[in-house]
Amino acid sequence: RPNADSMYPSKLYPMSPYVVGQSGRPAQYDPVALIVRLAHERSLSIHAWINPMRGMTEEEIQLVEGEYPIRQWYDDPQLRGRYIVSVDGRWYLNPAYDEVVDLICAGAEEALRLYDFDGLHMDDYFYPTTDPSFDADAYASYQASGGALELAEFRRKALDDLVYQLHEMTGKSRVGRIFGISPGGNVDRVFHTQYADVYLWCGVDGYIDYICPQVYFGLEHGSYDFVKVCRTYQDMIQTDSVDLIIGMTFGKAFSGEDPWTSGRAARTFWCGA
């Protein structure tokens, strides 16, 4: 689910342009069924991958059929700007609302029900902005009802609740399925500007089964060198129920180039060549 769409025929999300070429077109085949089958034939584990919050562009959403919640929210002047919010020309889902969280979880449950996935994976597109206007109405309602959290903590709590529900749903869908998240390597940005509380998720039971930080920085990066970032995430883990999996970039392994690892060391580091 790259942009509030679907790589398979879904009752909840429109087909992704990555499959059909343009928003609003029907599916001609099911690539997810094919990928899952081919992966398992090769003894590979495969997880359903979602971007829960990131949606589509203004141009794309206007092509979506009215049967889907994302288009219904766009067409409703009371919900557009609340359930879905435009940031720099792209629409994002706002997890401050139960209805939005319900859609995200239902979409993930649908994928796990329809296909023989081994787990669920949540990518790193969390809050797209620090601007208070993103969820101003939801936050004002929260304060009016007696809520005392600062905006940053309000947003982290919204993400915490979403992550908790996704983890719980994944575990209930089938014994042995796991749920994990791949935050960025810049932990300060992840926590302070994207409002993802990776410390909580890694520190206690019930949120994730694994953390897979995107450690795309080479050994010579001035602030976020590979070893430093790996150790930062390793130190976060305070429970035996969470595993650390290092997310590495296939792009640099393919190209053999990395501005933060010099010379032949780049190719050797990323792909062992």
Name the predicted role of every residue range.
Residues 12-29, 86-105, 147-158, 213-220, ...:
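The substrate-binding groove and active-site-proximal loops of carbohydrate-active enzymes
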Residues 1-6, 113-119, 204-211, 272-273:
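Catalytic domains of carbohydrate-active enzymes, especially glycoside hydrolases
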Residues 6-22, 54-87, 124-147:
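Aromatic- and acidic-residue-enriched segments that line the glycan-binding/catalytic groove
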Residues 131-258:
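Glycoside hydrolase catalytic-domain groove-lining segments
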Residues 25, 30-37, 47-48, 53-114:
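Active-site-adjacent "subsite" loops/lids of carbohydrate-active enzymes
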Residues 98-113, 189-206, 226, 258-272:
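Short, acidic/polar
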Residues 39, 104, 111, 120-123, ...:
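Conserved, mostly hydrophobic/aromatic
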Residues 2-51, 146-173:
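Aromatic-lined substrate-binding rim segments of carbohydrate-active enzymes
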